[in-house]
């Protein structure tokens, strides 16, 4: 009889834990940035855009005005999942929604003229 009660209690405990368990979610990350943002003939751009990401959005910040910033995101198969041009005022940012992206690795290409940033972003 004690065995049956222990089994019942254990079953209830496991059921309760399974019902309330929230899956752990790792933070999305920007990894492996590669930049070529300084050209010998274009010294007027003093800083590379800063990238950050959370579970909903990718943020691109810049301390200088970027007037025609092309942003392209490709999935692991090379398919374009996002492509658009952006304007970022000095000290401003642009926001790109990533909440609808499937889990996985994506390659981010950002360029303005001959200057570029390539980074890997991880969506978890």
Task: Please provide the spans of the model-predicted regions.
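Beta-strand signatures of extracellular beta-sandwich domains
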Residues: 70-74
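Bacterial Sec-dependent N-terminal signal peptides
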Residues: 1-28
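Short, surface-exposed loop/turn motifs with a glycine/proline- and acidic-biased composition
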Residues: 87-111
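Short, glycine-anchored, charge-dense loop/turn motifs used at functional sites
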Residues: 75-80, 106
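Short proline/glycine-enriched turn/loop motifs at strand-loop junctions of beta-rich domains
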Residues: 64-68
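C-terminal tail/sorting-segment detector
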Residues: 38-40, 109-124
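Transition segment at domain starts
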Residues: 22-53
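Short edge beta-strand/loop segments characteristic of extracellular beta-sandwich folds
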Residues: 56-63
